[in-house]
């Protein structure tokens, strides 16, 4: 172990790690080729619209921050996607090497332990074979964690400015990463004069705010909406309160009653709610994701585009105040789930391990239901309605809307014919990019074994607990640098739990921070002790 630890500190070690990581990625690719990940279509749409002066669907470009769509598009666009897998393997290697270098700041042994665990981590490999914000965040978070460790090992205002800039870049990957701005307190904890600490904290904040302000101005000038990203009010904390904990009720407060009146008058009399017999009590007691889509559209239409569905946030706050225990228990349960649930690749019985659409497999249940004496197609995915009432592009002026001609048939109406042409062109472009995803089928048996390995691999919570124990018992050198990436990972996980149900893909990209914590606290050097003279 001593020789290996010494070898890990040589100048050639990072190159060896990178080459090994590329090999691991391609071994996994035999079983699971690169495929579209969660919300894949939205990233294709956002990339396709990024370079349009007048996007037809603002939901794509304002609902996401630009870095994830940009990375997904750049991987698929050149040479009909021929470079997608080679480039992704290099990005995976870069992330693994970043974790290795971060751990090497605490010695060769922690570096060896960290890189070995990350390379063997099936869930991390699965995420890195899917095109979505999950893999992009995994790459960006690894690089940011390396930067944080190095800056905290040798702190300076300039270094903390780079860390703040890195936080802003993480926000450009996922809007929810704005929670990491609270790490501006970290410079106040370093060993330095108070003037230096305050300047460092200010540098962190100013660097982050400058880039995020530039994005806000860009969105305002280009799209007419001065925001980092739209849609936050429909997610945090409304999605969890409405969809997961089911605590939204008209009697919770004035905003809840106002929303219920709008639902009763403007949504439930329309298709498909009318034919599928959805009443007001059903709407709130048995909600579905398609209903959230309709609530967002309803809020924008009734209370104004500029409010960005603010009433949904107010409704969620009323629900949490009325049912604080239910919400708190739900959040705690989701945090626990995110820390211990494995990630699986979606497999299909036909032996195809290519696509990970996120859609469940067919359940084999009866495909029709009887409602009010009428036989209707059963909605997919166990939902109450077959599709949202408003499922079209997001347009501030309402010039594009959905018309229903039966309980299941509907189509888009464009008030301007040019908009319809642009909409068709957008989806043709998205189909072109989708066709560039590698079409290899993979190996069903090996993919199944990889899923089984993911199930039994030690979960993130184990590394977190080991790290905490190591900190308490050994008190290793450089504790602040060791702890900060793990704190950032926990912040991201808790924020996700405040908004959504358990989706392990949200936690796995940040899980190596807990591995780093465990390896550094258990195998890293202790602070040098000063012996008092006799």
Language-model region placement:
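Juxtamembrane membrane-water interface segments immediately following transmembrane helices
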Residues: 35-38, 42-44, 48, 204-311, ...
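Membrane-interface alpha helices of multi-pass inner-membrane proteins
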Residues: 160-174, 207-215
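Transmembrane-helix signature of polytopic, membrane-embedded enzymes
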Residues: 12-15, 99-120, 138-139, 153, ...
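Membrane-interface anchor segments at the N-terminal boundary of transmembrane helices
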Residues: 9-14, 79-83, 301-302, 310-312, ...
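Multi-pass, polyprenyl lipid-linked donor-dependent membrane glycosyltransferases
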Residues: 38, 63, 84-91, 116-148, ...
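Extracytoplasmic catalytic/substrate-binding loops of multi-pass membrane glycan-assembly enzymes
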Residues: 30-45, 58-71, 79-82, 228, ...
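Transmembrane signal-anchor helices characteristic of membrane glycosylation enzymes that use polyprenol
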Residues: 9-38, 207-219, 490
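Transmembrane alpha-helices of multi-pass, membrane-embedded glycan-processing enzymes
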Residues: 72-76, 84-98, 137-140, 454-465, ...
């Amino acid at each position: 172990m001593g020789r290996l630890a010494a070898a890990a500190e040589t100048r050639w070690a990072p190159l060896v790690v990178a080459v090994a990581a590329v090999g691991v990625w391609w071994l996994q690719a035999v079983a699971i080729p690169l495929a579209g990940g969660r919300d894949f279509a939205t990233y294709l749409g956002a990339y396709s619209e990024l370079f349009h002066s007048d996007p037809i669907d603002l939901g794509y470009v304002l609902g996401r921050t630009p870095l994830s769509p940009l990375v997904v598009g750049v991987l698929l666009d050149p040479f009909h996607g021929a470079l997608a897998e080679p480039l992704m393997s290099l990005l995976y290697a870069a992330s693994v090497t970043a974790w290795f270098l971060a751990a090497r700041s605490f010695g060769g042994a922690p570096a060896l332990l960290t890189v070995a665990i990350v390379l063997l981590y099936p869930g991390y490999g699965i995420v890195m074979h899917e095109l979505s914000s999950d893999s992009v965040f995994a790459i960006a978070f690894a690089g940011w964690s390396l930067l944080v460790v190095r800056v905290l090992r040798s702190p300076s205002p300039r270094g903390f400015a780079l860390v703040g800039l890195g936080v802003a870049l993480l926000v450009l990957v996922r809007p929810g990463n704005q929670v990491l701005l609270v790490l501006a307190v970290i410079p106040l904890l370093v060993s330095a004069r108070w003037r230096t600490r305050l300047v460092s904290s200010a540098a962190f904040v100013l660097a982050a705010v400058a880039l995020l302000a530039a994005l806000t101005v860009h969105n305002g000038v280009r799209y007419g909406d001065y925001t980092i990203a739209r849609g936050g009010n429909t997610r945090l904390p409304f999605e969890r309160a409405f969809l997961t904990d089911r605590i939204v009720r008209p009697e919770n407060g004035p905003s809840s009653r106002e929303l219920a009146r709008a639902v009763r008058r403007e949504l439930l009399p329309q298709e498909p709610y009318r034919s599928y017999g959805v009443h007001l009590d059903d709407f709130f007691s048995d909600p579905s994701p398609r209903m959230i889509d309709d609530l967002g559209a309803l809020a924008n239409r009734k209370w104004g585009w500029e409010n960005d569905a603010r009433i949904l946030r107010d409704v969620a706050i009323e629900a949490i105040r009325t049912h604080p225990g239910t919400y708190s228990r739900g959040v705690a349960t989701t945090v626990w789930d995110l820390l211990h649930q494995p990630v699986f690749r979606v497999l299909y019985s036909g032996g195809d391990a290519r696509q990970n659409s996120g859609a469940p497999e067919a359940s084999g249940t009866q495909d029709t239901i009887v409602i009010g004496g009428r036989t209707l197609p059963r909605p997919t995915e166990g939902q109450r309605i077959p599709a949202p009432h408003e499922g079209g592009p997001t347009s501030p002026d309402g010039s594009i809307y959905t018309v229903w001609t039966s309980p299941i048939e509907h189509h888009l109406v464009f008030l301007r014919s040019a908009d319809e042409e642009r909409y068709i062109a957008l989806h043709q472009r998205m189909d072109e990019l989708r066709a560039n995803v590698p079409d290899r089928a993979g190996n069903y048996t090996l993919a199944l074994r990889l899923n089984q390995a993911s199930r039994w691999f030690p979960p993130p919570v184990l590394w977190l607990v080991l790290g905490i124990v190591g900190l308490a018992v050994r008190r290793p050198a450089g504790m602040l640098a060791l702890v900060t990436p793990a704190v950032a990972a926990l912040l991201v996980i808790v924020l996700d739990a405040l908004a959504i149900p358990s989706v392990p893909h949200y936690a796995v990209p940040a899980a190596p921070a807990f591995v780093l914590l465990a390896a550094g606290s258990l195998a890293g050097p202790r602070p040098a002790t000063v012996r008092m003279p006799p």
